[in-house]
Amino acid sequence: MTQTVPQALQDFSLRYQQAWQDKHNELPRSEELADLVSPCVEEKRDGAVLWKAFPREEMADFTNVENAIELTLHEDIKLFFGSQYSADMDATWQGNELTLLQVWSDDDFTRLQENILGHLVTQRRLKLKPTVFIAATDAELDVISICNLTGNVILERLGSDKRDVLAETLTEFLSKLEAAV
């Protein structure tokens, strides 16, 4: 049976949590998110929060972004950002480091939507095919995105048409990610 995006994301989140626990003997920890409310927070300790990914009861709604840009987002984009709350998670893809971007809270989701809209407006202005970022890399202008037309996961150079396909599907990409803690 084919794995869904929410299942693949949950599986990676559990692999990340387990890798963190194996290394640090506690749930994943964040100092940066210590003062922000989230359903992910399990415990506050020493100026940090211990957290774990938390499934959303209802899928997040991207209608406002789609209406504003007059574009239907690829279903995998909506499933990726709309199925759980989590802190960002460090990972490697074929030995290359990245940070998988996630939604910490409803306030964070609002900011994400604004960033997605700004990204899509810029792409439209530059006459580029629409993509939505899902991970940051060490290279300032390189991001990992989902192509809105094909659903391919790509390495994209911001502001240019330079794109390399990393995986045919998001589930394939998530299943091959390795947690980096």
Curated annotation (Swiss-Prot):
Compartment(s) where it occurs, according to its Swiss-Prot or TrEMBL record: Cell inner membrane
Pfam family, one: Syd
Entry GO CC: cytoplasmic side of plasma membrane
Topology class, membrane: Peripheral membrane protein
Keyword Protease in annotation: no
Keyword vocabulary terms for this entry: Cell inner membrane, Cell membrane, Membrane
Keyword Cell membrane belongs to the record: yes
Protein role: Interacts with the SecY protein in vivo. May bind preferentially to an uncomplexed state of SecY, thus functioning either as a chelating agent for excess SecY in the cell or as a regulatory factor that negatively controls the translocase function.
NCBIfam families per record: PRK04968.1 (NF003439)
Family per record: Belongs to the Syd family.
Full protein name: Protein Syd
